[in-house]
Design a protein with these regions (language model features):
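A generic signature of intrinsically disordered, low-complexity regions enriched in glycine/proline
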Residues: 20-22, 67, 101
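Hydrophobic beta-strand-centered segment that forms part of the acyl-chain substrate-binding groove
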Residues: 39-77, 81-89, 103, 111
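Hot-dog-fold acyl-thioester-processing enzymes
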Residues: 2-59, 115-139
């Protein structure tokens, strides 16, 4: 449906690594969140806009495959690929070093819930879908 890709650059900070000097596995999720926030900012419908529209987008599924370690002070990028945005908001994350070597691959699935009732929606809100479609069409 979508398959739009955007790339965001980062550096592995000292507080991200363990005593062996490699990034602790839990911190990959934090970087995915930062990349997802940048992606949503580009779309023009970020988490603050979702709050104003009275819905949230919790993650209901996350999977990851760690291929090669990230080390302290290593520069890397995350390629975010939009996979679906009808019932689920699905993204694929590919962590790459600056030479293009794959370091990690992950996927998240998110569903919309109404903030007041916490009720799960069967589809993503129309305004969010419209923003995503406009973003895809413009790229």
């Amino acid at each position: 449906m979508a398959n739009l890709k955007r790339t965001y650059h980062f550096i592995a900070e000292f507080f991200d690594v363990d005593s062996m000097g490699v990034m602790w596995h839990g911190n990959y999720v934090r970087y995915m969140e930062m990349a997802r926030c940048r992606f949503l900012d580009e779309v023009g419908f970020n988490y603050l806009a979702m709050k104003e529209a009275r819905f949230a987008l919790p993650i209901v599924k996350l999977d990851s495959k760690f291929i090669a370690p990230l080390e302290f002070n290593q520069r890397f990028c995350i390629e975010v690929e939009l996979l679906e945005f009808e019932c689920f908001f699905r993204l694929k994350y590919t962590f790459l070093d600056l030479d293009g070597k794959k370091l990690c691959q992950a996927h998240t699935s998110q569903v919309a819930i109404l903030l007041e009732s916490k009720e799960t929606c069967f589809y993503l809100p129309n305004d969010f879908i419209k923003a995503l479609k406009a973003f895809v069409d413009s790229h």
